[in-house]
Amino acid sequence: MEGKLFLGQYLICVILLLGQLHGYKSCIEKERKALLELKAFLIPLNAGEWNDNVLSWTNDTKSDCCQWMGVECNRKSGRITNIAFGIGFIIENPLLNLSLLHPFEDVRSLDLSSSRSCEDCGFSGLFDDVEGYKSLSRLRNLEILDLSSHRFNNSIFPFLNAATSLTTLFLTYNNMHSPFLVKEFKDLTNLEHLDLRGNRFNGSIPTQDYNSLRRFRKLEILDLSDNLFNSRIFPFLNSATSLKSLSLWGNNMGGPFPAKELRDLTNVELLDLSRNRFNGSIPVRALFALRKLKALDLSDNEFSSSVELQGKFAKTKPLSGTCPWKNMEELKLSNNKLAGQFPLCLTSLTGLRVLDLSSNQLTGNVPSALANLESLEYLSLFGNNFEGFFSLGLLANLSKLKVLRLDSQSNSLEVEFETSWKPKFQLVVIALRSCNLEKVPHFLLHQKDLHHVDLSDNQIHGNFPSWLLENNTKLEVLLLQNNSFTSFQLPKSAHNLLFLNVSVNKFNHLFLQNFGWILPHLVCVNLAYNGFQGNLPSSLDNMKSIEFLDLSHNRFHGKLPRRFLKGCYNLTILKLSHNKLSGEVFPEAANFTRLWVMSMDNNLFTGNIGKGFRSLPSLNVLDISNNKLTGVIPSWIGERQGLFALQLSNNMLEGEIPTSLFNISYLQLLDLSSNRLSGDIPPHVSSIYHGAVLLLQNNNLSGVIPDTLLLNVIVLDLRNNRLSGNLPEFINTQNISILLLRGNNFTGQIPHQFCSLSNIQLLDLSNNKFNGSIPSCLSNTSFGLRKGDDSYRYDVPSRFGTAKDPVYFESLLMIDEFNMVNETNSQTKIEFATKHRYDAYMGGNLKLLFGMDLSENELSGEIPVELGGLVELEALNLSHNNLSGVILESFSGLKNVESLDLSFNRLQGPIPLQLTDMISLAVFNVSYNNLSGIVPQGRQFNTFETQSYFGNPLLCGKSIDISCASNNFHPTDNGVEADESTVDMESFYWSFVAAYVTILLGILASLSFDSPWSRAWFYIVDAFVLKVRNMLWQNTAGTKCSYVLVSLSSPSVVVLLKPPALFHKTRT
């Protein structure tokens, strides 16, 4: 009986199959030829990036076009119904000939979108020389038209308006602009789905068009996202009462939430207003009018209050912990400024599937009432300031939960879990960052479907959890950085893991040699800041998909494996810095044809710069500084026109700087400092990148500065070389931001062009031979007046990012994709002297430092009073010059100065009391001048040591423990010139020299006689010398280098002694 039944079923199936085959027809010849004509039209316009669709269309009469890729036909009529062209990179912005589409009379769906979205590619318009604007009316059954990612503008609307049968129209990411006029497609009344996202529509809609959307009674989905609309568009949208989905993310909307303007959209189920600038409170009650609302996205705005979410209302009764959104399924409020505790009313939304409150300022405890949300699939609370204890056991009954993301920015949240706990859910994503975990949660042993695990920034210790890989064959992302793991182990069999980050742990053992065999599919690996030892494993060459590899800050040693250099051809970023790797660097060609960034600094590499670097055509950043490289810099490096940053500092490179380096078009950072380079700076450097950083300090460079060198650089460091001559008179003052010339042999006066340094931040001209006066116009320089201007960056960033769309469950809203972004900064490091010491500044600290150092030169004259106007200056050093006059009262305006050094000059008069207003002053030095009067007291002056005033015998006061009551001190009022009784030291020196020579000759003449009168003569000379010495101690402040005549007890010995080392001018 069963056999007969089976036979009957089999016969029925055969009959049905034969019936279908009998009814099937192949494509119509006219349409086959039309497809080939379309192909012939499109191919010449393409830059070679087609998918397989059009390429599969062959001119073979035996080939059924209904079987071609991208083509679908009606099985009965044989007519084409759907065409997806798969257009690639269209060049020169041609027009699309619509007449080529006319043969497809029964087509229902046309996909003419481009697979490439760029600013200058794709079709720019439509045309039909015969039918004109009515061309698309020939396609009477056309329902779906996709013209996305081209350069179409508003001129195509008259053509589109003729396609009255359209129900779905995609015009995303084109070049359409304001105004947005509905009358342009007023006849498309059958539209159900209109997508205009990614254009340039802006402004508001004319008042007369406010009700124009009413004619589109079938319109259910409208997407105007990623345009430039403002909030005045809402009265216009309020008339589209048939809408079920409205997306306006990424526009220019601001102000309070437009609840009143949206009150008539009672059919809306999805509302996306994310990535705008709405502020104020989220109007829970006002949104109650949208009774059918299922998905609401208000993320990435500026909402700052969750008062209504807390169930607290003015003039109304409280919600008593109940939200009025009974149909809500998905709610995204992330990346706002919501403060206060977790909104408890949300825990009453039992139908909620997605809840995202991440990246706000919520505090307090994570509520246990989350257990009420039994439909929850996605819960994201990371990026807040939750505190206290939270037990994961409270979520045990959420059987549908797939994504759990939780952390605490304040690191005050402690997540607890029971050892024996076995939840009902099977997670796909778990992220528990900064949750004070000390071990991997035990319940993960029961999770078998994990794709993404993030337990970073905790205190987990012990072995690397290789069992996570063994239990979860679909695991793609494993992030365990910044923990305390001590033993790195891997499973025995290969795994499909894509992203691994175990940086900043406490691994301190030999690295696994089978790493590349067990994890062959890795795309991104970060093992930095550990203690891994041994040679780099040759198995790394098995990771054919690897793009980002960071092994820096470990203890790897030995040479680079040859198999590694030949095998990982997809590498984009390679970081091997701060290890003990040795041998030559790239002596032969490597297979890193896609490599952008290579960091090999702080190792033990030796020998010449290898020719293998010539095989890296895509290289943007090369850092092999702080090694032991020798030889010359090869000129062929200049062939790498894609270089952004080249860092070769702190090696033993010799010879001259190749001129070719300055011909690299986009070179932003060139660091050749601390080598043994010699010769002149290449004279023709005008082609260097605009805004470049050039670091050549600590070499043996000689000659003069080329006139063209300063045209484009923003940072120039030439300190401690052998450069000489005058500074170039022409300087592009709009660019230079940091100019450091210390420790050379420059002469002449400070050029007046320096007064126009509109972006200067650090200026160091110290330890040279500049003379003349300090230009008073230096007060016109910026020195921090543009500190809010972020137009200059001293670092060269290189970003590596990989995004992965979450396919863990279906969502009405855009769920945040997984981004693994690694940024490598080629940092500019600058040393600058402040507070009597050299400190290194880089990154954000460098951008906040403003200083001027003119010390150790031969500058003379008075200090310009205008320097007191440099109000943002933080360090000023004028020491070891021949400056005269008084200390400026205007210095009191330097409120930000932390270090002021005026020592070893010839300044006189009092220290102005107004200087006590310099509230930031930490280091003050006026030693070895000719100052007089009372040392000010109060504020910062109470903290300065007596050494700050040495060599000024006429100063007195409590700060230096010298009483001002003695008759020897006659304080001078501020603003009064120096005491007329002060010895004219210059005249005194000349008279002293003449007297000294006369006496010396007399002494030498009498040395041959030994008589009572000669001994009496020596006693008289002793007394005279003692008197002269006392006078010198009181009046020689400000002299740089003096000699004191001292007579010893022996009448026949007279010596010259230098003053103590404290008196001496030092040159560093």
Curated annotation (Swiss-Prot):
Subcellular localization: Cell membrane
Keyword Disulfide bond in record: no
SUPFAM superfamilies: L domain-like, RNI-like
Name assigned to this protein: Receptor-like protein 13
Topological domains annotated Cytoplasmic: 1008-1068
Gene name as annotated: RLP13
Extracellular side: 24-986
Positions glycosylated per UniProt: 59, 97, 153, 202, 279, 397, 471, 482, 501, 570, 591, 663, 700, 735, 745, 771, 780, 822, 877, 882, 925, 930
InterPro entries in the cross-refs: Leu-rich_rpt, Leu-rich_rpt_typical-subtyp, LRR_dom_sf, LRR_N_plant-typ, RLP_Defense_Trigger
Keywords carried by this UniProt record: Cell membrane, Glycoprotein, Leucine-rich repeat, Membrane, Receptor, Repeat, Signal, Transmembrane, Transmembrane helix
SMART domains associated with the record: LRR_SD22, LRR_TYP
Pfam families named in the record: LRR_1, LRR_8, LRRNT_2
Swiss-Prot/TrEMBL LRR repeat ranges: 104-129, 139-162, 164-187, 188-212, 216-239, 241-264, 265-290, 292-315, 325-349, 350-373, 375-397, 398-423, 424-447, 448-471, 472-497, 499-517, 519-543, 544-567, 569-594, 596-615, 616-639, 641-664, 665-688, 690-710, 711-734, 736-757, 758-781, 846-870, 871-893, 895-918, 920-943
PANTHER family assigned to the protein according to its UniProt record, in alphabetical order: RECEPTOR-LIKE PROTEIN 14, RECEPTOR-LIKE PROTEIN 15
Main location: membrane
